[in-house]
Each structure stands twice: as structure tokens, then as C-alpha cells.
Amino acid sequence: MLTKTMGNFFTEVKDTGLLQSEQLHQYILDTSVFPRESEHLKELRKATESHPMSFMGTSPLAGQLLSFMLKTVKPKKTIEVGVFTGYSLLATALSIPDDGKITAVDIDREAYNVGLALIKKAGVESKISFIVSDAMTLLDDLLADGRYQGSYDFAFVDADKTNYVNYHERLIELVKVGGIIAYDNTLWGGTVALPESEVPDFMKNNWVCVTKLNEILGSDARIDIAHLPVGDGITFCRRVY
């Protein structure tokens, strides 16, 4: 009976994943994430919590995964689309090589200023070129220039979901073969598994955009992908050709 019960339990866990409770999520944060989070990132996370749009910030669990990936890949030229207060940007700047550079674009300079003092305090401001711009305009300008095609080692996207597919078509040309693009919020609060009729109205527009992106990434022969249930979902894409 015990064996059968355990078998049923682990079959269900294998199918659905373990993170079915807030307690387990908090355990991971308390045991493995927060003890490893740098003091500068911790301060920025706390500062972001007082922002009225704090829910837009990168989760510390996703930030840890991002840092781990960057320290492994060691990209020297990266681009970040969507910055908000800069948690993921600071995590990137702390993780790439000393001579690494980040082009960061966001329309909201005020939100970026929340984290700027901590970016300076961490001593990594020189790695960052922050551009106040509509991201589509910047990406189109980079492609039109010609010098930037296939020049980036890594891209991170956490911006307006309505343009995720458009960003993908541009970033796939801007990252080099073997380079990586990471998209945040690709599970959209878990609603991607729901039929559209069950998605709350306030989430529906972005639900359409995120599910469309997921379908495209799942069938795009130009990339290998890993879609992970970390934070609000993060998808890593490696350009194959």
C-alpha cells in the first residue's frame, strides 16, 4: 500500500512539477536564493517592493537562474529589453565578465532611477549603456545600422508582451549563432494552460501575446529552447542558425 501510494504521488509530481505550494516556494527562497543574493541585489529588491508597480520586477528565483546562466556562458556583449528598476540588469552586470557590456533599453527612466544608486554602489555602472527609448525603435535602428547583426552574445526580454513576437524576430538577427535569448513571464501567472474563456479579462490581452510567443518558440527551427517554470516562467532560446 505504501509503495502504491508513493508511486501515485511521484507520478503526479513528475507530471505537474513540485511547486504546488507557497511554502515550498518560500523554502527554496530561504534556503537557496536569499542566502546567495548579493547585498546590492537584496537592497534593490527591497527598494522595488515600495514601487507601486513592484509586481513587474524580476523574481529573485529567476534572477538567480539568470546569474547562474551568465556566469556559465560568460557573455561579453548583452542587450536587455525592459529594465524597470534594474534587478535583472544589476544581476546581469554582476555576473558578466569585467569587460562585458550591456545595452539596456526602457521607456521609463524614473523606474530605472530607483536602482541606479545601487548599480553605482555595486561598481558596475560602467558596464551599462541605458537608453530611454521604445524598444522596437532601438532594435530596428540596430538592425538598420548593419554592424550589430549577429553581434550580441545574450539578450534578456522582460517588457511589453504585445511586442514579444516582434522582439523575437529582431533579436534572432541581433544575437550571434550560439547566442542566447531569454524571455521572462512566459507562463503569465499560470494562465497559459487555461482556455481563453477562463482567463481573467485584465490578463487576456497579454495572455494572447504570451501564448502566441510560446507557440512560435516551440516550432522555431532557428533555436533550441528550454521553457522553465521558474518565477513567472522563463524561456531560454539558443540560436542555431
UniProtKB/Swiss-Prot annotation:
Domain of life, source organism: Eukaryota
Cofactor annotation remark: Binds 1 divalent metal cation per subunit.
GO molecular function: caffeoyl-CoA O-methyltransferase activity; metal ion binding
One GO biological process term: lignin biosynthetic process
Pfam family, one: Methyltransf_3
Binding-site residues, S-adenosyl-L-methionine: 58, 80, 82-83, 88, 106, 135, 160
Catalytic activity: (E)-caffeoyl-CoA + S-adenosyl-L-methionine = (E)-feruloyl-CoA + S-adenosyl-L-homocysteine + H(+)
Binding-site residues for a divalent metal cation, renumbered to this chain: 158, 184-185
UniProt keyword annotations, A-Z: Lignin biosynthesis, Metal-binding, Methyltransferase, S-adenosyl-L-methionine, Transferase
Pathway: Aromatic compound metabolism; phenylpropanoid biosynthesis
InterPro entries in the cross-refs: Cation-dep_OMT (IPR050362), SAM-dependent_MTases_sf (IPR029063), SAM_O-MeTrfase (IPR002935)
Binding site residues for substrate: 14, 158
Cofactor dependency: a divalent metal cation
E.C. numbers: 2.1.1.104
Enzyme class: transferase
Family of the protein in this entry: Belongs to the class I-like SAM-binding methyltransferase superfamily. Cation-dependent O-methyltransferase family. CCoAMT subfamily.
Task of the protein: Methylates caffeoyl-CoA to feruloyl-CoA and 5-hydroxyferuloyl-CoA to sinapoyl-CoA. Plays a role in the synthesis of feruloylated polysaccharides. Involved in the reinforcement of the plant cell wall. Also involved in the responding to wounding or pathogen challenge by the increased formation of cell wall-bound ferulic acid polymers.
UniProt protein name: Caffeoyl-CoA O-methyltransferase
Organism: Stellaria longipes
